[in-house]
Amino acid sequence: PYRRQRQMSIRDRTKDPAEKISQPGYQTGKWMPAIVPGTVLNSLVHNKVYPEPYYGMNNKLDRNIIPDLAKTGREFYTYWFRTEFDVPENYKDKIVWLQVDGINYRAEIWVNGYLLGNMSGMFKPEYINITDFARIGQKNALAIKVYPVDMPGTIKPKQWGAAGEFHNGGDGNIGLNTTMLMSVGWDFTFNDGIRDRNTGIWKNISLYATDKAVIRHPFIKSELSKPNYDLAKETVSVEVTNPTQRGIKCTVKGEIIGENITFSKDLNLFRGETKEICFTPEEFPQLTIKNPRLWWPIFKGNPELYELKLTVSI
């Protein structure tokens, strides 16, 4: 993951096209070091463009020391983030992924001169297949253009509400975005808001490779018998994706480590298809566990957990 603050650079407006910015070797002499994960304002404060907002009265809206998104417009806090990275030789003949865990609020994802993805919403991760554009064993470039929320809102109280109500969220317009509502002002942060509304790459970005089938988003639902809690019925679900251009037949296997419980299913996937596969205790009786080791709160017992291993093979 690109975590260290100087592994990415940041810049606002530039006349260079995205195709050029996202090429390896692009000159970033006028760019600033970026804080990733972090926000645009986080990086600007780090580079002494603006003072620390938590110091004194620096963040007060009426002092206008740090410009507010609602006054400046979205372009003011629209920034490019850029870095270069190597793709290992052992990624050859595999599917190469760029996983972006969280960007606020909209973003264009460019790799080696190509627009490979768009994101919107603060909390939705994106899995971008860069196999056809990655340069194995060579230098690669990643450039991300990040846009603020569509509706920044203001600290002006909304027109409706109960008498004496604390006006968290200002005029409420920030709620039209899928984002962090407290960015416009809340009683346990700044009453008058975060100036850039937390625009930026706020979670990790990862590069990795997989085989021709991929599993994601495993989920386990436990149903305990009552009143004795001496039986646990486990339902396991997982998403399986075929990122290739051909149909595949694959096998998903599961194992509850240390319990001698295994289960598996075969399935066919068309090219680019994603399916959710489900293992139920009705279909797999071994998923009914007798006398399960339960998780107990502190001072009530041991916080027991089971370990589940899921694999997919072709």
Label every model-predicted segment.
Residues 3-7, 11-314:
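Secreted/periplasmic carbohydrate-active enzymes, especially glycoside hydrolases
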